[in-house]
Each structure stands twice: as structure tokens, then as C-alpha cells.
Amino acid sequence: MKTLSQSLFEELDQIVLIDSHSHINPHSPASTDLSDLLGYHYYTELAHSSGMQRADIEEPNLPNREKVRRLFGFLGNIDNTVQWSWFVELARELLGFEGEVIDQSNWEIVYDLATTRMKENDWEEQVLSKSRVEKIFLTNDFDDPLTGFN
């Protein structure tokens, strides 16, 4: 017999979503590698709050893999946050990660999975389909050009 929370989750999981506030690049809306995803302010601000210096990941010409390695030196400190649970679920559901924990010992597995998956021609469509996002409304600057995307 299903619990009330299971029944509610199943019903909520059927809802098509509309993202009413997004900062994605409309000309390249899907992440292209793990540094792109973990470079989002949710993760960088939490890593900064746990001791990472801004310069550690904002160094000019820093390779993306190295940026992610440096982030993982601090992301273990945020494993009790909802943002981290989102990332782990994303790694499982979208990237095919099969583990329970992502940390300094195995982040490269996730990086390599992301590199492979995010290069697939239909990556953007896969993300939208699995996440059940139907529309995304952008948060633009007042002078951003609004051409070249739907």
C-alpha cells in the first residue's frame, strides 16, 4: 500500500513544469560540461561559504576539469543542502551515475559521464523531456537582444 507521501509525489511528478525565472543563455540553453553546471551560482556560492576562495575557480584560462576538481575540494561541505541533493539526483537521472555519493574520490566518473551525455545531439531535448519542463521564461537584462530563439 502506498503512503500518502508516495501518492502525493506520484501526482506531483505528473505535472508539466514552467520555469518562470531562468538565467540560461537562450542561444545555448543546455550545459555543455560539468563545470558549466557546477559553475551556477547555487554551487559556487555554497562552495565559497564553505571556505573556497573566488580566485580558486575564476583564474584566467583555468581548464574546466580543473575548475570542477577545485570545486569538489569544498562541495563535500554542502552535502546537507537541498542544492546538493538536486545535483546528486540530476547526476543519477540525467547522466546515468549509479552511486549514492559524489565526492573527491569519484567526481571524475560524473565528469566523464557528463562530458559524454552533454555532447549528444539531443541533450537539450533529453533534459526537457525528463524534467517535464514545457516552457522557460528568461530573466534578461533590459538591453538584451531578444532575437534568435523561441
Model-derived features with residue positions:
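Metal-cofactor-binding active-site regions of metalloenzymes
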Residues: K2-N150
